[in-house]
Amino acid sequence: MAVEQITNLISEQTFGIWFLIGAALVFWMQAGFAMVETGFTRAKNAGNIIMKNLMDFCIGTVVFIVIGFSLLLGEDLAGFIGKPGFDIFTAYESFDFSSFVFNLVFCATTATIVSGAMAERTKFLSYCVYSGVISALVYPIEAHWIWGGGWLAQLGFHDFAGSCCIHMVGGISAIIGAKILGPRIGKFVKDEKGKVVKVNAFPGHSIPLGALGVFILWFGWYGFNGAACTTIEDLGSVFLTTTIAPAVATVTCMIFTWIKYKKPDVSMCLNASLAGLVAITASCDVTDAKGAFVIGIVAGLLVVFGVWLLDYKLHIDDPVGAVAVHMMNGIWGTIAVGLFATSKAPGYAIAMENGAIKAEGLFFGGGFTQLGLQLLGFVTVAAWAVVCMTIVFLAIKATIGLRASKEEEIKGLDICEHGLTSAYAGFEFGAAGMPDIDITYDDVVSVGSESVENAVPAMVKTSEIPDDKKITKVEILMKQERFEALKKAMNDIGVTGMTVTQVLGCGAQKGAPEYYRGVQMEMQLLPKVQVEMVISKVPVMDVINAARKVLYTGHIGDGKIFVYDVENVVKVRTGEVGYDALQGEDD
């Protein structure tokens, strides 16, 4: 008996530690949301996105301490709400610290989902207000129904880790906010009757940053779904289903977009990974590999459909796909419990023992019992979120205003809301990006001065341009991969100086069709090399012929050669002008 007690104690302590580690992983997901939202939006708003994700958690912590936690896990009042209280201040010695931290990080996740759908045009103050309301009232009350012993929990509604009470609620808040807020300037083109006739794509400025965010979220999701597990078998099963669903969703999305758009869509596949994670969250403990596989397939298709629906039918601007990922797949994940719950999953017996589920899913012989409960929970929680967030957003719009001004949106919220010239100042040229340099009058070089130490002494020579030595500038736009061949060809004919620049551009053909999140872009800017050469000795036609010889493939995009007359040239170091300025030093 003593051995069994020791074993149980060790198990309890181990899973208690894992519970807090899981909470830390969920907190780390805030970084993932920040990276996804930043990468999928434009650079001029990157700092604003980061600031909003930071304040989600910080404001959420304050209001959750004061209001939210007791409403969520306080003494149940009629199955609807927890009894308000301040035990964290008045009874700290007996306070459930672990439960508070765990529920806090879940609460912050709900609020941060809204940020992406309303990105690039929301006033920062307004964002802080509605984020606080979500964390203080909207999330804690509906989460009490499910996790705090409320009426849905008493009925046997099952949402193990939050497909419904976190992701669906966050997604519903996002779509309501985005609808009331309106689209970004230029997203939808309307005719004189106000009908949308065209949808424009606004590509995010950093797909790698978005991908980093997805991997951070996926990693954190093992804590998100697994932290509440109390046996090693249950934990292992949750990890397995949490891996299968997003992987299958991503492959499904890749195949579908490959067929539909002729190329696999990177950003859509990143969204599909998150969609699979959202969809499996409610049933991760009570479904098996087969169920997770099917849930993932539907999630991968649903996210593509959701993005298309918002863009082309509802005309709601969602820059990061938050609605398709969280709302639609939150609904799907909630319903999926009633379809795929099985007693073969280790967590099913635990859920049944705790009254957290009533029956197996429809496809496993349980009939419509659990499916009916899941539908009831989805409808009531959705209705709560719709009513609350509609009131909140309309109230904000009528008072302090919800949307940034047109000028602020065009300039970018970084500079207008935060005084931040650029979130990437180190990569910019100009005042914002260059290091400070101390300049004294001793460093100034005067023309004609005999005391100049900075310049190499040289005789100033001037000459008339020979009649047969006209100065010409040749500019070549070409494919990057042909540059080394061009450089060798120019060297072979005696051209020894050139200026090379990496550029983006396209010709009249606008490049091949390109899609971003299912929307065809106006034109595709392709990476090119721009080579500039100023020549006098070498005949222009020799340069043109040599360039054409190495650049020609017979396909669109071989490049173009531009020829300009040059009026004069001045060599800064020596003061030489004209033809002489282009010549090297005499031996």
PLM regions: where:
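Glycine- and aromatic-enriched membrane alpha-helices
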Residues: 2-462
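Positively charged, small/polar-rich N-terminal and surface patches that mediate targeting and assembly
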Residues: 416-422, 435-587
